Amino acid sequence: MMVSKKKMGRPSKLTVSLEKAKAYLMGEYKTVGDVVPNIAGLACYLNISRSTIYEWSSSSNVEFSDIVEGILALQENKLLNSGLKGEFNPTITKLMLSKHGYADKQETELSGKAGGAIKTDNKISIEFIGIPQRESAN
């Protein structure tokens, strides 16, 4: 009769961190003083480096990657809603939202030296053609 072997030993740091990361996403971030969930806050909460978080989320661990994506989505949502309500500092909100792809509208105007026109080699000719006069009926 074959006896199956059970894995014995301590769970990996990733396994333990997965449960804690879920708790952080589900609201535990508030209890540690974070206004919005963020990667640095998660790193402090798990007592690991940010680079470890990025390594775990880019590896084949889909569950941890989903938690990190959830944290970023919740952060974006809280920034938008609290920023619109005036609950967050506008400058900080704008800075943090830029990490989510938001940006001010930028207009670009081209000008030459001292703000003048840009010189080109294109020559444009305009030819004025007179209107033929009608003969009078007198």
UniProtKB/Swiss-Prot annotation:
A Pfam family reported for this protein in Swiss-Prot or TrEMBL: GP3_package
Annotated InterPro entries: GP3_package
The name this protein goes by in its record: Putative protein p17
